[in-house]
Amino acid sequence: MWTASKLSIATLIAVGSMLSVGSFAQDNEYVEEVVSIGTRGKPRSVSSSPVPVDVLSSEDISKTGTDDLLLQLQGSVPSLNVHLQPISDAASMIRPANLRGLSADSTLITVNGKRRHHASVIAFQGGGVNDGSQGADISVIPAIALKRVEVLRDGASAQYGSDAIAGVINFVLDDISEGGSLSYKMGEYTEGDGATSTISGKYGMPLGQDGFVTTSFQIRQADDTSRSAQRPDAAALIAAGNSAVANPAQIWGAPKIDDDVTFFMNSGVMNSDGSESYMFGNYSERDVDGGFYYRNPDGRSGVFTIGDYRAVGNVD
């Protein structure tokens, strides 16, 4: 009896230990993010990737407190910098984003894993690394249309080509098949300028039994900002009686943005053979009014003269 009782007690202790270990493992179970960028093989988890990859969910992006996707990414991705570009020609309208200190066209931009075309703007007069670069326009992608953003912060030109020297940013569009959301944001700077209002939304619909159609939109208005001081030469013209000179004559700040409208659509359906048919696209437009360098008529004698006659001599 003593031996049997001892064996029974030992068996119970062993079984109890096994159950507690199993319960502990189940409580700490988690699912890793799987990414496909930065590897030639099959998709792998972030922790097993041989290169630095950041995965940002739509919730992570929305926590930054701004409605500008460029600024949202700058606040979430290490080594990604985006600058306001006052008086930088068209770069004031399509702001370049720099990953790892390299030019905007050194970062490959993809949407759903497909290469995004470059913008029509060549950055000019902004100075620094972006002069002459022609990157993709990230600002046309509304944050509400995204499921997640994958950022490869390492050179990948051997895999993707020379436009991935700085890395790769892959925007994965949301693929909901029902429901949606609507949001409205507004704000301004403490100086009292730069008032911004944004309304955005998305809605998902089923496509057959195994498909989806997700549509999203964003409408944004932004007033300009100015941190300018009057130029001395413009102030001298005003003092001389020229009332046509603006104050300030040259504006340094963010441009005014009107009717910034963006629409995105993402759809997909599973075929009977296991393959997937998909389609996505976008439409966007906006009007931008920004400042430029001041042309002093008093110092442009080669332009405002006809022979020895000064064409602007009597301008008030």
Language model regions located:
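N-terminal periplasmic "start-of-domain" segments of outer-membrane beta-barrel proteins
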Residues: 33-64, 91, 120-131, 180
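Short, polar/charged loop or turn motifs at beta-strand boundaries
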Residues: 49-74, 96-102, 133-139, 186-190, ...
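Non-catalytic regulatory/gating segments with a bias toward low-complexity or hydrophobic composition
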Residues: 53, 61, 73, 149, ...
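Outer-envelope beta-barrel architecture signal
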Residues: 69, 107, 176-180, 209-213, ...
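N-terminal periplasmic accessory domains that precede
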Residues: 69-72, 76, 97, 110, ...
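Extracytoplasmic beta-strand/coil segments of soluble accessory domains associated
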Residues: 74-119
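Short acidic/polar hinge/loop motifs at secondary-structure boundaries
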Residues: 114-153, 307, 313
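Transmembrane beta-barrel wall of Gram-negative outer-membrane proteins
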Residues: 191-316
